[in-house]
């Protein structure tokens, strides 16, 4: 692991304008070949694997190191219509004692007639709970410390209806247990209707327009999605509630090496929504720079604009700006305050069109580094 960590630091710091650069590139390319980080995809390998480590710092996890294992594959090598499928496995451990694993799979079948997307995670993370709403999130001295033990799984199967239009059906499972609560803090979680342990299970249906050229890192196209998920005791859930998700993103290639991307995203819930399932304002994808879980409410809206620039060799950079708001009802969103988010990031093309990203996000009164695979959106 130490050798991999040193390699990642070299990728971040090595010069891009010197005679020694060529030798450095050749040497680093040789190391990367051993890690599976070829700049070409070989479908004959079945799943073309690669591994990449890297450091990170986030407000909630502290300083840590993560490792991403990326596999590219084509279920049918003769299928020239579908884009390449990707399987990403990520793991991390941090100075706060947090550790976790996650999986993302984007699979395309039968000339893109069928798609199977799977996202899942398990984590053990020391964190804090502030409560619901801006008022609770602003009271930093009244937060409750606990360890979040989380297991999530969300598979979805899509069928193409007409060109670029897909109908999907799936399932959402989320189990969360608040362990090791600090009894010197105010008992916020214990006071919620659901208590420290919550299990949510629901069926979902969604419809989307998707003409992105490559899902993990689009250069052009649009993605518009509506998803409805119903959670109920009859489906295994502790409580009954509904979640509506709306998303739109657009990708415009300004040149061969630059892309302008923007998105608008909303999550809206109603019913007996557990504290653990309320939408969040702050994550490694949206509103980067805020402590994940500090701001949560029944309804959340955010947007961001990001400029992406490919440099020489495998290097790239991004810069973004965004904002978000939240509230207990739809009408309250008109009166809620907006939080800003901005930042810059470094990109390293680990596999063809698959980037490892290191972002630094700045929010109002907080900031953080994020190490992930694939673009934020």
Regions found by a protein language model. Give the residues of each.
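Cleavable N-terminal export/targeting peptides
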Residues: 1-37
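Short loop/turn motifs that connect adjacent beta-strands in outer-membrane beta-barrel proteins
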Residues: 21-23, 37-47, 61, 75-84, ...
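C-terminal outer-membrane beta-barrel translocator/porin domains of Gram-negative envelope proteins
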Residues: 23-24, 192-196, 203-311
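Gram-negative/organellar outer-membrane beta-barrel architecture
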Residues: 41-50, 56-195, 355, 363-377
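Transmembrane beta-barrel architecture of outer-membrane proteins
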Residues: 48-50, 64, 98-100, 148-152, ...
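Membrane-embedded beta-strand positions of outer-membrane beta-barrel proteins
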Residues: 51-53, 87-91, 116-120, 167-169, ...
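Solvent-exposed loop/turn segments connecting transmembrane beta-strands
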Residues: 55-66, 91-101, 111, 197-198, ...
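Outer-membrane beta-barrel "beta-signal"
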Residues: 204-207, 344-350, 366-377
